[in-house]
């Protein structure tokens, strides 16, 4: 919720001490409302006032930290409205359905995309590790291999026992993408115990919303929403609805970063996956999962991302 300067001034200490660098408390509060300075410049706000103001001014979309990466935290739909805050990140998928040689080749290839463009490192930030096995040891071994790349992980696993085994062999730079309307309680308990972000997926957007509400009621707001649908059209509609519901309608239950798996939407078609990835770079994926990331794919995607997430105010 956007507060006006007068709203903030009503809760201010009204000392006019000038310690913040502004001539009056009213001037300071106007700057806070404009986003020019932060509240912590004034040491005299009461704890109660700070709690009220921080709650009211918190972004409608939460920032979720995964290791060194920050996801979400956006305050606008489009860059020209103000600026976009945290760039989307790319992942390459491996799965227990793949043979060992394929997995090894994919993990080796993703590490070859690592270069600098205009002072920014361009590389594959995540490995997306899928599971179609009932054997926890098999999945844990694959996760261990993926973790050895040094990249953060997204663990797509809906089996609680397999997820437990996987989390034992990797660090905390992980999203456990495993909560569904059927298993959310068990997955929530596991993610909370391990201190990792929990990914949430459902067959449709209504069930996704209901599951998020249940997780929030259980005390978990360290969430990422997997909005991947059956088609690219459905997925784009999901991503757009989730972002607009949070930013425009002010509904914080959809105010979380999102995952889009273009590897599922265009399986085996690298060109179409790249096209889809560019679309979801613009609207509105926080993590985009692909089957591969070659230099031919990376150069246009990372260039596009850097252009979109450059602050137009600077």
Language model features with spans:
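Non-heme iron-sulfur electron-transfer modules
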Residues: 2-4, 30-60, 64
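Catalytic alpha/beta core domains of metabolic enzymes, predominantly
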Residues: 182-314
């Amino acid at each position: 919720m956007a507060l006006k300067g007068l709203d903030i001034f009503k809760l201010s200490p009204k000392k006019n001490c000038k310690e913040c660098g502004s001539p009056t408390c009213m001037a300071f509060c106007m700057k806070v409302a404009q986003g020019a300075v932060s509240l912590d410049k004034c040491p005299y706000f009461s704890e109660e006032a700070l709690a009220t103001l921080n709650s009211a001014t918190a972004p409608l979309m939460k920032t979720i930290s995964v290791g060194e990466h920050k996801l979400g935290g956006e305050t606008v739909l489009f860059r020209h409205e103000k600026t976009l805050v945290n760039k989307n990140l790319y992942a390459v998928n491996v799965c227990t359905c793949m043979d060992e040689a394929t997995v090894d080749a994919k993990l080796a290839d993703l590490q070859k995309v690592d270069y600098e463009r205009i002072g920014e490192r361009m590389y594959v930030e995540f490995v997306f590790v899928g599971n179609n096995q009932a054997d926890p040891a098999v999945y844990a071994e694959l996760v261990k291999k993926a973790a050895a790349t040094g990249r953060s992980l997204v663990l797509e696993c809906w089996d609680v026992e397999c997820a437990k085994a996987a989390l034992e062999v990797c660090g905390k730079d992980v999203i456990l993408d495993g909560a569904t309307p059927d298993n959310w309680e068990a997955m929530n308990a596991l993610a909370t115990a391990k201190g990792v972000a929990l990914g949430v997926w459902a067959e449709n957007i209504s069930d996704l919303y209901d599951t998020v509400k249940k997780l929030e009621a259980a005390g978990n707001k360290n969430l990422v929403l997997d909005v991947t649908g059956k088609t690219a059209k459905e997925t784009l509609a999901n991503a757009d609805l989730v972002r607009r519901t949070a930013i425009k309608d002010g509904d914080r239950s959809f105010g979380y970063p999102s995952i889009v798996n273009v590897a599922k939407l265009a399986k085996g078609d690298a060109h179409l996956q790249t096209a889809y990835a560019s679309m979801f770079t613009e609207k509105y994926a926080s993590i985009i999962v692909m089957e591969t990331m070659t230099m031919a794919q990376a150069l246009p995607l990372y260039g596009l991302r850097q252009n979109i997430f450059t602050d137009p105010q600077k």
